[in-house]
Amino acid sequence: MRHSIEMEKLTLGVCYYPEHWDRALWKDDLQRMKQYGIEVIRLAEFSWALMEPEEGKYDFSFWDEFLALAAEENMKVVFCTPTATPPAWLSEKYPETLNADGDGNLMYHGMRCQHNLTSPKYLEFCEKITRRMAEHFNKYDCIIGWQLDNEVNCETNEYYSKSDHEAFRAFLKERFGTLDNLNEKMGTIFWSQTYTDWDQIHLARRSTVGTGIANPHMQLEQVRFISHSAVHYLALQASIVRETAGDRFITTNGIFGNLDYQKLMESGVDFIMYDSYPNFAYAMDRPDGGEGDLKDRNSSFNLARTRAISPLFGIMEQQAGPGGWNFRIHQASPKPGQLRLWTMQSVAHGADFVSFFRWRTCSFGTEIYWHGLNDYSNRPNRRLEELSLVKADFEAIKDIAGHPYEAAVGILCDYDNEWDGQKDVWHGPLRNFSTDGWFRSLQKKHIPFDFVDFREETNLKDLEKYELLVYPHAAILTKERVEILTQYVANGGKLVMGCRTGYKDIYGRCPMQPMPGEAAELCGVTVEDFTFLAPGEPMEYVNWNKKRIP
């Protein structure tokens, strides 16, 4: 398996939905795409009802017709499994496939992603449609790769259906073996939370303080379980597609919360595709940080995070116009030159393939305001003119494909601390504050850096490529990670550790030792006392090189 995309040259693509348009438009669309340098189209990620209109009755004639035309026009295709949008008949007949909120209320048909990831019945239907598609469409040479599902964990990354509670118990049984071990690791003696039967265990439900708030150690295990479920869900599809895929790649698009993408890469997915919408930084109800808040660099942060998963990756959805659903999100239109800027920003961070969303703005449905390269009128516009410039750019620098991004600075990150910080009001804000602080400093000084996923599998060679490593938030820190960091420093590497280092163990419990815990010898210090500033207290500063640093 690759873990990096393999393109012979920089390549342009676009997301296309022939099912939304009259057949009379298809050929002209494909020919115009080629005029603008587009060589690859993504298809079918939302077309389950078209391919299985009734249970067990498969009809691939629509896609046979279109793929024949795509092959005739020498257009390459990334074909998708449509499991993000189960058809109405499935959701209605099999309510056990539906997701639920923390209070047990089901999420019904009418939008997308109303399903859960653990229902045996839903996994059965996913397996069937994936297998039928893989076997049927294998004959089309124009298909160069497969996208599994679409944006897993996007609409929601929490699951509370009956099958999720059952699968959570099975996950904990596999992880801890016995109730005695689970009770000890989860500290359930506190507040008389001790479990005496596996059936007493549930995902975090409504409690005296709200929905989704429970034992903090169990909450951390819950997120690990959600990631485990998502990886298993996609791995099932990957294994089926792999049987007939040949040398076609298998990917999925992201990146979203509560999902360990490194484990996903080990489960049968070749590399990750990122969905890049730079104006999300201004449109998702985020507070204004004032002048210099670097919202324009938000995509740089996410692209670097993607590169930690796949050193060379692709963009499956690059923002092409203003965007938003009819009930949320207000993304402004790209300014003149900005579409080109965003495209080159993706390339500069390691993308060898950039696919725009979408070819033409849809004239119906929830995304009528999510504009593509073409407007509703299908007439030439400034975005298409700018695409011509991007085509020329790609031709001029096409040979940089395959060349990895080079950085001497690495920011260590890990899913344990990310997930632990999500509901920890003491440590969560510090994680974002410290990581963002390093990101801002490196960006302002134009210093290339990588995010480095620190995992059990990380070895010394992975770290020694960096002259400087920063671990801004290592609240959860294991002895094994300290040992490899100690080797890195002993071999001449420079390491900066953030505040609250070593505060917790792998289960989120606080060891009976002074901070920084296992890293005390490595850091050469112990922390005797610490505090937050009380409300109204002035900010503390240190003077360094004639500067006041908060």
Locate predicted features.
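Polysaccharide-binding and catalytic clefts of secreted carbohydrate-active enzymes
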Residues: 103-297, 301
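The substrate-binding groove and active-site-proximal loops of carbohydrate-active enzymes
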Residues: 11-23, 44-62, 108-127, 152-157, ...
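Short, acidic/polar
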Residues: 20-35, 126-132, 254-265, 335-345, ...
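Conserved, mostly hydrophobic/aromatic
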Residues: 14, 33, 41, 70, ...
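Aromatic-lined substrate-binding rim segments of carbohydrate-active enzymes
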Residues: 27-107, 131-134, 236-244, 475-476
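Short, well-ordered coil/turn segments that N-cap beta-strands
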Residues: 8-12, 37-39, 71-77, 139-144, ...
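Carbohydrate-binding surfaces of carbohydrate-active enzymes
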Residues: 201, 247, 277-280, 286-550
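An acidic-aromatic substrate-binding cleft motif
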Residues: 2-25, 30-39
